[in-house]
Amino acid sequence: EQLLMVDALKRASAKRITAVLPFYPYSRQDKKALPREPISARLISDMYVAAGVDRMVSIDLHTQQIQGFVDQPFDHLTAMPLFVDYFKEIVDGPISIISPDAGGVKRATIFAKHLEAYVGFVHKKRDPKVHNEVKSFTVIGEVEDRHAILLDDIIDTGGTIAAASRILKERGALSVNVAATHGIFSEGSVEKLHDAPVDKIVVTDTLLQNGNPDKIGNVEVLSVSPIIANALTSIFTDDSVSALFMGENVL
């Protein structure tokens, strides 16, 4: 529908078209994992460019190289300020920020700086032939007698979060909270997360939840509207978007 709207605006001689994609579709498919697979993230960007967009805006991309799929300006926003403010209010005591994978350590490090926290990550061994299947988990970092916050960009099946939260509890974490920008909550995830030893799951409204927070029971949904509004204001007044995040939107 958004592509159709872009086409309609282009045909109506719009001076400039900015497409806002709070959640970038197929962002995890930015490269081939197996032979004869599509690079779906690249296809999405090609479709928007072909439709006529002049600029794209998205929040917490799974991989930032997606910005290089288009020659047009591509603004990458982050919901991290929302999570920082939220956890400053609800967590009192020593904190460890845990990334569910090694690739998210940089994001976790920036997040930890604002909360004066330790940083760790979960090493996952995946089976490339089985979609969303993880063989084993290992926690790297100090979590004993600390409040652990699992920080990720996406919650999909919930398998990683459920398994990691149990390991963190076994390692002596005082509490386990989860912060993820995009709550996909695909089939089967509600049951996994409902049974997981997680105190609070915090996501944003980049995706429509359709009652999932109520089913899981301990989910808080934060609005990204202020972040998008401030970014669009900066874009249309020719101000710096990165300045809104003090450069910390480049992860």
Which role does the model predict for each range below?
Residues E1-L251:
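PRPP-associated nucleotide enzymes
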